[in-house]
């Protein structure tokens, strides 16, 4: 494991050097694990963390598993603060304020797309518009208990699969 701290110029310093130079007070840290997992945290409440391709807002974070299958971030890509997670089992995005677009999700609110045995389940809190980069298929609107409400209108545009909000729907079952 390697722990480093960023200095004011964005250079990553080993902990021993960062302690001597007071860089640890900036609260901008990167941890690299033996399996290739990397975690970057900007604990600074006022300054951005910009170093080696990482650009995080105050109190932001970014991490990627060693195999590249899991990515999590709290960032402000395109000027929109959002929390994002992408994994083999689900994609999650919570936008803060306006529409957020990340690698495999797009929404103005909070949305989740989880893998099921025969496709996916899309949950959009407040039944707000959202889109995911999934192959798609037929969509069925479900209420909170999982009861079918009817077929929902779904579209694929520019690689984004979206379901038109269906009145009373809690989630959407998307079959391959």
Task: Locate each region found by the language model.
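Carbohydrate-binding surface patches
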Residues: 11-49, 82-138, 143
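C-terminal beta-strand-rich structural cap/linker in extracellular carbohydrate-active enzymes
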Residues: 55-114, 118, 156-176
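Short acidic, gly/pro-rich beta-turn/loop elements at beta-sheet edges
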Residues: 50, 132, 149, 173
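Solvent-exposed beta-hairpin/edge-strand motifs
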Residues: 54-68, 134-149
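Ordered core of a single globular domain
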Residues: 4-11
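Short, surface-exposed loop motifs enriched in S/T, G, D/E and P with embedded aromatic residues
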Residues: 151-155
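Aromatic/acidic polysaccharide-binding cleft in carbohydrate-active enzymes
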Residues: 1
């Amino acid at each position: 494991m390697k722990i480093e701290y960023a200095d004011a110029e964005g250079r990553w310093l080993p902990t021993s050097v960062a302690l001597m130079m007071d860089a640890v007070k900036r609260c901008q840290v990167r941890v690299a694990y033996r399996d290739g997992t990397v975690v970057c945290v900007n604990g600074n409440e006022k300054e951005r963390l910009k170093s080696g391709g990482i650009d995080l807002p105050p109190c932001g974070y970014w991490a990627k598993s060693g195999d590249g299958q899991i990515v999590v971030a709290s960032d402000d890509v395109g000027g929109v603060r959002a929390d994002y997670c992408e994994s083999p089992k689900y994609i999650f995005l919570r936008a803060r304020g306006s529409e957020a677009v990340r690698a495999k999700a797009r929404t103005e609110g909070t949305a989740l797309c989880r893998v099921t045995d025969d496709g996916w389940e899309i949950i959009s809190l407040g039944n707000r518009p959202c889109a995911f980069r999934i192959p798609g298929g037929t969509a069925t609107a479900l209420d909170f208990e999982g009861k079918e409400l009817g077929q929902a209108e779904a579209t694929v545009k520019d690689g984004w699969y979206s379901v038109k909000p269906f009145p009373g729907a809690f989630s959407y079952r998307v079959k391959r």
